[in-house]
């Protein structure tokens, strides 16, 4: 009788272990810089990754009608062209730190999600502040 319970527990633990670790491998998303990607391009082709760096000044092209954003992401050493379909976040700008989730396809990073790094400090508007004062505070924090 004890053998049946032990066998049942082992089967359940084995199934749980397979679901946790087997699923983890398929859903793992790597975080890379442009330099890391360029060192091992073949490994990351058509695999989901997060690419982090700075938006290179002078490279941002946004087509409002098609909602297509193109820019170059750099880590100061290497550069990678990025394509993102959709409206960029309000704080997106040249020289800004960003993380783009997506896949590399034919040398271009096809972004599906664009995250903008912003200041960690929060200062709520004080009572009586005008919208211009609030806007100035936000711009200074960036």
From Swiss-Prot:
<protein>
    <recommendedName>
        <fullName>Cytochrome c-type biogenesis protein CcmE</fullName>
    </recommendedName>
</protein>
<keyword id="KW-0479">Metal-binding</keyword>
<dbReference type="GO" id="GO:0046872">
    <property type="term" value="F:metal ion binding"/>
</dbReference>
<feature type="transmembrane region" description="Helical; Signal-anchor for type II membrane protein">
    <location>
        <begin position="3"/>
        <end position="23"/>
    </location>
</feature>
<keyword id="KW-0997">Cell inner membrane</keyword>
<keyword id="KW-0735">Signal-anchor</keyword>
<feature type="binding site" description="axial binding residue">
    <location>
        <position position="122"/>
    </location>
    <ligand>
        <name>heme</name>
    </ligand>
</feature>
<dbReference type="InterPro" id="IPR036127">
    <property type="entry name" value="CcmE-like_sf"/>
</dbReference>
<comment type="function">
    <text>Heme chaperone required for the biogenesis of c-type cytochromes. Transiently binds heme delivered by CcmC and transfers the heme to apo-cytochromes in a process facilitated by CcmF and CcmH.</text>
</comment>
<keyword id="KW-0349">Heme</keyword>
<dbReference type="GO" id="GO:0005886">
    <property type="term" value="C:plasma membrane"/>
</dbReference>
<keyword id="KW-1133">Transmembrane helix</keyword>
<feature type="binding site" description="covalent">
    <location>
        <position position="118"/>
    </location>
    <ligand>
        <name>heme</name>
    </ligand>
</feature>
<comment type="similarity">
    <text>Belongs to the CcmE/CycJ family.</text>
</comment>
<dbReference type="GO" id="GO:0020037">
    <property type="term" value="F:heme binding"/>
</dbReference>
<keyword id="KW-0408">Iron</keyword>
<feature type="topological domain" description="Cytoplasmic">
    <location>
        <begin position="1"/>
        <end position="2"/>
    </location>
</feature>
<dbReference type="InterPro" id="IPR012340">
    <property type="entry name" value="NA-bd_OB-fold"/>
</dbReference>
<dbReference type="InterPro" id="IPR004329">
    <property type="entry name" value="CcmE"/>
</dbReference>
<feature type="topological domain" description="Periplasmic">
    <location>
        <begin position="24"/>
        <end position="142"/>
    </location>
</feature>
<keyword id="KW-1003">Cell membrane</keyword>
<keyword id="KW-0201">Cytochrome c-type biogenesis</keyword>
<keyword id="KW-0812">Transmembrane</keyword>
<keyword id="KW-0472">Membrane</keyword>
<dbReference type="Pfam" id="PF03100">
    <property type="entry name" value="CcmE"/>
</dbReference>
<dbReference type="GO" id="GO:0017004">
    <property type="term" value="P:cytochrome complex assembly"/>
</dbReference>
């Amino acid at each position: 009788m004890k053998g049946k319970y032990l066998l049942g527990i082992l089967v359940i633990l084995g199934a749980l272990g397979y679901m946790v670790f087997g699923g983890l491998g398929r859903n793992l998303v790597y975080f890379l810089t442009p330099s890391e990607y360029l060192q091992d391009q073949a490994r990351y082709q058509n695999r989901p990754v997060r690419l982090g760096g700075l938006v290179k000044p002078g490279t941002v092209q946004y087509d409002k009608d098609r909602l297509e954003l193109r820019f170059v992401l750099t880590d100061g050493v290497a550069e990678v062209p990025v394509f993102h379909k959709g409206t960029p976040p309000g704080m997106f700008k040249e020289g800004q730190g960003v993380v783009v989730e997506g896949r590399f396809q034919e040398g271009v990073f096809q972004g599906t999600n664009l995250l903008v790094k912003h200041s960690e400090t929060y200062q709520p508007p004080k009572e009586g502040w005008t919208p211009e004062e609030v806007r100035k505070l936000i711009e200074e924090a960036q």
